[in-house]
Amino acid sequence: EEKDGKLSINAACKMCKLCVKKGPAGAVEYVEDEKKEEIDKSQWNGIAVYVDHVDGEIHPVTYELIGKARELASKIDHPVYALFMGNNISDKAEELLHYGVDKVFVYDFPELARFKIESYTSVFEDFIKKHQPCAILTGATTVGRQLAPRVAARMKTGLTADCTILEMDENTDLSQIR
């Protein structure tokens, strides 16, 4: 925006950089943010599914997501993991192996008996840092809608909600369509 012979950037700026290209030389300079650290995707392996449940009764969306994870994992030859957190749930964990999960990671502690965003987010973070799955699927349940954005923000990664189509690229990028 030009005001009193001076250029200024306001809230309407769309970052098109036309002012840099077309404006007077040196009047506006575009400074890029620091380059983000590149991630070695070969270190990230597996597709994880968050097991949503109430008192050990697994929500049906979990089984749907396991099926989709299995389909996606087969395209890139990766394992399917299930992340199961709660209290007195170990006996239910084995059941998930019959639905195509290669490995179930169980966090069974009294503190996890009821959903608390802080503790569940911390457990999720611990799981991700230790096991480095290349993608995580979480159901659009009451808990999932609270937990997924918090975990994505904590891990500084993306999140797509309410996807209708999921596809896995050969380079392990997850393509989502809403």
Where are these regions (language model features)?
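N-terminal glycine-rich FAD/FM-binding segment characteristic of electron-transfer flavoproteins
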Residues: E1-R178
